[in-house]
């Protein structure tokens, strides 16, 4: 037998032995992945966290230990393969997750659907979409970084959609790791009723395993890749701490769970099952967060985390999902969807993500009720369009596996469906049922964009059409004033990634201009109007009169526009009111102070007048235009700017310089904290003052400082900033400055 043959057969034997050992350890074969399970044996989970907390590495380990992939690769690995879930070339190159990726796997005969989401604030809509359709989540925290800005954002998103979660403190192997500090931050910053259900046996380079406080056992991860799990007694030097932490766990649980609370007050002994049942009840009700520990990179703590997903996170039947039946002139009627996997109720599904695949548009959906089979017809509740299902697929990152049917609780994808993110699909178009859509934040940064070569215009148009459809936070428009094409998004990185994708995926290199902030204009106080639009010069004319008031909305609603019809009687016929609203919303697209959109304003239509022949919807729309111009002249206006939450981490010796630079950029310091030679400062800074900060921070901290920022709210500009914005706008329009204009008059 030749050496090559021997090597090959040896390799096959090794692989077979590896797979046999997988089977012995309770791992599953690939043939079982697509089996349909009863509802108790399904989990839909997301893995979310701040950037660089180890989400994708953790997902890679989960897929390996469950037998879904045969070998592991690192996010920035030396083998240049990259993690399974980072399928986009750009993700592997940058070592960050840009799109949420879906997969499914099997652990202890339970089907787990997993969505790995980005941690960078610029891709926050990906997290938003994932959490909307999931039943539970794993919140990954870095044992060194702790609770960071994007952790707080993800926490708010989980609260918005009522998603129960487990916390996993990762990276115990890193220098400076301190899981106890992370737990105290979870309690103080995130207001979680949280406690350890595991403790680390050593940290940094001494990380040997974990202590399970529920079972009161030590767990060690041995063999290649930590696949052999060994249970042992708790080390002697950790027994006192383990007892104290177990007591702390029981106290926190007793405060949140009535059943366990009664046992605690009666001082009755607890069994392992009592604690597990209380953990499950409180976790599903979001009254307690179990905290697990480990290091995904060093293969410790992942299998117990999978057990916790099964033990403590809900199955689709334990989560209440609501549909809304629209009724004319009434509030929508709430309907609880039936999660049973028997197919008795009509199909209801929600499209939560669109993607252009190799075979056309791919639409990710979650089935909430009923069953969907190949060949069925479904209807889009928003457009009422019929779609015939030619192909059903389940996804494993960028690979697809065909299935014949999907049931309530499944996450799947369809091809060639014309829809938008957040659309509801049903098999019965007559019931007018729709589900709550997905919250989409407003873009805060704009940049001019143009293709480098005019011959690439077609590809440029295709890329823009695809990306704006896939990502609701990526907007595209043409500015007639400066004759420029603009794109807007959640940050500079967001827009840079799309520019790079245009070049890579469409062969269309583009040039991005300087970032522009999405300012807004709003009223300072109420302003009344009484406007008559009259145009009569033979034949049918135009006549419309509107009376009312425009007033500012509260600061918490300053990104919204409201229209209220307060008319009584027939002075303004009801069929013309939509014309008034349309005119108001058209004028709100561009203010007269600085050319930015209006927001934070309520338009109250109170009275008016019409002509029996000459009045029309168009006339009332033009009257609305005139009324708003009148308010621009008579009202008091101010400019709003986006305020960012900024978090800077750097060595202690640079604290003075960092805080000085933030103050110089009109920042308000909201808090600081320090740990072992490093400090973190939290501040609120106007986005307009944050451009170029990355370079300044690098130079002032010898390259050791790093920062993250996320959108917080809109707030009024400083007077000198407002004057500067108004002056720049007037110069760009070729208008004289106000004082010069007065001299001419």
UniProtKB/Swiss-Prot annotation:
Pathway terms, separated by semicolons: Protein biosynthesis; polypeptide chain elongation
Name of the gene encoding the protein in the UniProt record: mEFG1
Organism annotation: Drosophila yakuba
Note: This protein may be expected to contain an N-terminal transit peptide but none has been predicted.
Similarity comment: Belongs to the TRAFAC class translation factor GTPase superfamily. Classic translation factor GTPase family. EF-G/EF-2 subfamily.
GO BP terms, alphabetized: mitochondrial translational elongation
Highest taxon, organism lineage: Eukaryota
Function: Mitochondrial GTPase that catalyzes the GTP-dependent ribosomal translocation step during translation elongation. During this step, the ribosome changes from the pre-translocational (PRE) to the post-translocational (POST) state as the newly formed A-site-bound peptidyl-tRNA and P-site-bound deacylated tRNA move to the P and E sites, respectively. Catalyzes the coordinated movement of the two tRNA molecules, the mRNA and conformational changes in the ribosome.
Keywords: Elongation factor, GTP-binding, Mitochondrion, Nucleotide-binding, Protein biosynthesis
Entry binding sites for GTP: 49-56, 116-120, 170-173
Record-given protein name: Elongation factor G, mitochondrial
One Pfam family per UniProt: EFG_C
GO molecular function: GTP binding; GTPase activity; translation elongation factor activity
Keyword match S-adenosyl-L-methionine: no
Principal location: mitochondrion
All residue ranges annotated as the tr-type G domain in the record: 40-317
């Amino acid at each position: 037998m030749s050496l090559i043959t021997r090597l090959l057969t040896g390799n096959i034997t090794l692989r077979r032995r590896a797979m046999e050992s997988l089977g012995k350890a309770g791992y599953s074969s690939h043939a079982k992945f697509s089996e349909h399970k009863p509802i108790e044996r399904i989990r839909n989970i997301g893995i979310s966290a701040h950037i660089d907390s180890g989400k994708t590495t953790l997902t890679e380990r989960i897929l390996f230990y469950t037998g879904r992939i045969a070998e592991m690769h690192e996010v920035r690995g030396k083998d240049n393969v990259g993690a399974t879930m980072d399928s986009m070339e750009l993700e592997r190159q940058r070592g960050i997750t840009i799109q949420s990726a879906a997969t499914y796997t099997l652990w202890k005969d339970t089907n787990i659907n997993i969505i790995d989401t980005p941690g960078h604030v610029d891709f926050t809509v990906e997290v938003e979409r994932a959490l909307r359709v999931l039943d539970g989540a794993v919140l990954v925290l870095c044992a060194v970084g702790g609770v960071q800005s994007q952790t707080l954002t993800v926490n708010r998103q989980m609260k918005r959609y009522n998603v129960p979660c487990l916390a996993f403190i990762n990276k115990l192997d890193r220098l400076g790791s301190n899981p106890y500090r992370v737990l105290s931050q979870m309690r103080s910053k995130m207001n979680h009723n949280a406690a350890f259900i595991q403790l680390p046996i050593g940290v940094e380079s001494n990380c040997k395993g974990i202590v399970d406080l529920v079972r009161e056992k030590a767990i060690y991860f041995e063999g290649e890749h930590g696949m052999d799990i060994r249970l042992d007694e708790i080390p002697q030097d950790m027994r006192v701490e383990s007892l104290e932490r177990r007591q702390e766990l029981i106290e926190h649980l007793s405060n949140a769970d009535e059943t366990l609370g009664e046992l605690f007050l009666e001082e009755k002994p607890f069994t392992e099952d009592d604690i597990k049942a209380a953990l499950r009840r409180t976790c599903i009700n979001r009254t307690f967060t179990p905290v697990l520990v480990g290091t995904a990179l060093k293969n410790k703590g992942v299998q117990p985390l999978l057990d916790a997903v099964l033990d403590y996170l809900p199955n689709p039947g334990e989560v209440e999902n609501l549909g809304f039946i629209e009724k004319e002139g009434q509030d929508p009627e709430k309907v609880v969807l039936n999660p049973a996997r028997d197919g008795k109720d009509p199909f209801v599904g929600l499209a939560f993500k669109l993607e252009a695949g190799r075979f056309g548009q791919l639409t990710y959906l979650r089935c909430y009720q009923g069953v969907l089979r190949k060949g069925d017809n479904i209807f889009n509740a928003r457009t009422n369009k019929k779609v015939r299902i030619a192909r059903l697929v389940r996804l494993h990152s960028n690979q697809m596996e065909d299935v014949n049917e999907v049931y309530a609780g499944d996450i799947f994808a369809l091809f060639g469906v014309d829809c938008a993110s957040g659309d509801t699909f049903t098999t019965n178009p007559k019931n007018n049922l729709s589900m709550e859509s997905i919250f989409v934040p407003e873009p805060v940064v704009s940049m001019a964009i143009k293709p480098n070569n005019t011959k690439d215009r077609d590809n440029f148009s295709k890329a823009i059409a695809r990306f704006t459809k896939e990502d609701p936070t990526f907007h595209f428009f043409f500015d007639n004033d400066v004759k420029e094409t603009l794109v807007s998004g959640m940050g500079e990185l967001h827009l840079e990634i799309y520019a790079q994708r245009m070049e890579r995926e469409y062969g269309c290199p583009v040039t991005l201009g300087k970032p522009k902030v999405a300012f807004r204009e709003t009223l300072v106080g109420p302003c009344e109007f009484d406007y008559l639009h009259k145009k009569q010069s033979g034949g049918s004319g135009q006549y419309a009169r509107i009376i009312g008031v425009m007033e500012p909305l509260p600061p918490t609603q300053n990104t919204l526009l409201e229209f209220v019809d307060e008319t009584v009687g027939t002075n303004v016929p009801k069929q013309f009111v939509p014309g008034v609203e349309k005119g108001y919303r058209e004028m709100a697209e561009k203010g007269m102070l600085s050319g930015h959109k209006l927001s934070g304003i309520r338009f109250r239509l109170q009275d008016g007048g019409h002509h029996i022949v000459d009045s029309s919807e168009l006339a009332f729309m033009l009257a609305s235009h005139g009324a708003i111009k009148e308010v621009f002249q008579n009202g008091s206006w101010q400019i709003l700017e986006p305020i960012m939450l900024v978090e800077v981490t750097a060595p202690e010796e640079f604290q003075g310089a960092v805080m000085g630079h933030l103050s110089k950029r009109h920042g308000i310091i909201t808090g600081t904290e320090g740990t072992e030679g490093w400090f973190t400062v939290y501040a609120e800074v106007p986005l307009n003052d944050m451009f170029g900060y990355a370079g300044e921070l690098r130079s002032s901290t010898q390259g050791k400082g790093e920062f993250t920022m996320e959108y917080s709210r809109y707030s009024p500009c400083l007077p000198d900033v407002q004057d500067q914005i108004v002056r720049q706008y007037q110069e760009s329009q070729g208008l004289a400055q106000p004082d010069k204009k007065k001299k001419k008059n």
